[in-house]
Amino acid sequence: MSGHSKWATTKHKKAVIDAKRGKMFAKLIKNVEVAARTGGGDPAGNPTLYDAIQKAKKNSVPNDNIDRAVKRGSGLESGGADYQTVMYEGYGPNGVALLIECLTDNRNRAATEVRTALTRNGGSFADAGSVSYLFSRKGVVIVAKAGTTEDDVMLAVLDAGAEEVNDLGEAFEVLSEPGDLVAVRTALQDAGIEYESAESSLVPSVSVPVDEEGARKILKLIDVLEDCDDVQNVFANFDASDELLAKLG
């Protein structure tokens, strides 16, 4: 399992996420609000907002909360904060490279939270540019198998700009350039294939293999980072087998 694959890490952390559902809801709602502020409140004309709404719905965020977030982001309702996207770079145990994406209205608070989480869990802050070059921005669509074959997926996305389809065990991962993400997920929808998530993500070009102890440490660090209110996503370039992750899960 490559560190960028949200599918396996999401399965591993399901019990943790269930215990922190309120915090997860808040982050998903923040994502919707920022997408609406950046590209407008109409999902039909704002693919980023569409995907943020779909992700929130798939995680059972109430429709009323989603609607209010869109209105706040669009300026139709007061109360929205001035969130900014900030990317921090760091290293975890075993030299695993980390990119920590935050949405925050207080950069100093976010930096302090991230630095504390790193230093208390075997990691360290890194200078800007020392880690980011190891990752590339890609469109990532996750398709649960559920009777769908790799050939089905490849046939659907072949002409939509997909670069590769990877078998993750219980799901397929479709990679594309970020600009082709909408075309890829639309092609899947047109083919009647359900997808779990569609989003712009950071994919590592080089991965660091980790053993059981290393995987345990890096997963703990990711859990702590993602528990920070301002942290939206954590991208890591570790590589561990599905069997190992299943054992740790």
From Swiss-Prot:
One GO BP annotation of this record: regulation of DNA-templated transcription
Q: Which Pfam families match?
A: TACO1_YebC_N, Transcrip_reg
Q: Which Gene3D superfamilies match?
A: 1.10.10.200, 3.30.70.980
MF terms per GO, please? DNA binding
Keywords attached to this Swiss-Prot or TrEMBL record, sorted alphabetically, are: Cytoplasm, DNA-binding, Transcription, Transcription regulation
Q: Write down any Gene Ontology CC term.
A: cytosol
Domain of life where this protein originates? Bacteria
Protein localization: Cytoplasm
Coarsely, its chief localization is: cytoplasm
Q: Which family does it belong to?
A: Belongs to the TACO1 family.
Q: Which PANTHER family match?
A: TRANSCRIPTIONAL REGULATORY PROTEIN YEBC-RELATED, TRANSLATIONAL ACTIVATOR OF CYTOCHROME C OXIDASE 1
What protein name does the entry list? Probable transcriptional regulatory protein Strop_1792
What is the organism of origin for this protein?
A: Salinispora tropica (strain ATCC BAA-916 / DSM 44818 / JCM 13857 / NBRC 105044 / CNB-440)
